[in-house]
């Protein structure tokens, strides 16, 4: 089996004061210009050795170039990012209950950045390169589709951050057709790039301060979900309950509260966590018509300047009600 694809994006965004604007104090107009180009390509190759045991090997190759030239008044941020990724995977089933998946991967990132953070500063440059080879193994136990246990372990070596190990586990219990329960736990790491991820903040008049000791982000995350399929009036009422918790051990914090004249990118010094609870109900009242209601409660807090506070711009409550209708032939859906 072979797959390949390419993708290209070219975008130009402008904003700020219009060209017809004439300032009375002789100051130049403020404008924003963001030009983006992105090119992607990938290939997927797979070969099946044994169909009965689903023994197969697969190779995935992908690459991308992301180029952005951004101007926010006097402030400038230009970046060229090259990414290359390769993954070799092997899967097999020992029997109907036990299976194994393992593989090797290689990821390459190269950020070539130039920026000017104030009209009084010279244009600066930075080059960030990271090569990350890694390997993983994953074991799955499946007991008659009623109990499924999946455990995995991944190890990577970063040319910038060193070695890190990522464990992960999933459990699914489905004793009958009406109820199933899922649980998961694991660890995650992420490399941070302060300006590449947050250059929109340059539109502010605040001074940008980036601490030199920013480290890789590290967090534990846990989740549990339950699904009920309840027969009701010859139809099925679907109920879903979900809860997820993330505990950050290391994190890049964007602090805009400690100093009203600064945007400070700093390392987490204290607690940072996220609690998310969601409930959802869906019911087909008549043929083609389905009504869905959902409610989400989010509690996200981070330590800013030694004080644990709610993270800004994260809605605590969210509700959603949707109605969907599909015509009898399935051609139209509203």
Locations of the language-model features?
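Residue-level signature of outer-membrane beta-barrel architecture
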Residues: 47-49, 88-94, 141, 155, ...
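Flexible loop and strand-edge segments within Gram-negative outer membrane beta-barrel domains
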Residues: 1-57, 63-81
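Gram-negative outer-membrane beta-barrel transporters
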Residues: 142-144, 239, 243-247, 265-334
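Repeated loop/turn-to-beta-strand initiation elements of outer-membrane beta-barrel proteins
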Residues: 2, 12, 50-57, 96-100, ...
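Transmembrane beta-strands of outer-membrane beta-barrel pores
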Residues: 8-12, 63-67, 106-112, 153-159, ...
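Membrane-embedded beta-barrel scaffold of Gram-negative outer-membrane proteins
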Residues: 56-70, 174, 180-182, 213-267, ...
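Surface-exposed extracellular loop regions of Gram-negative outer-membrane beta-barrel proteins
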Residues: 1, 51-73, 99-109, 114, ...
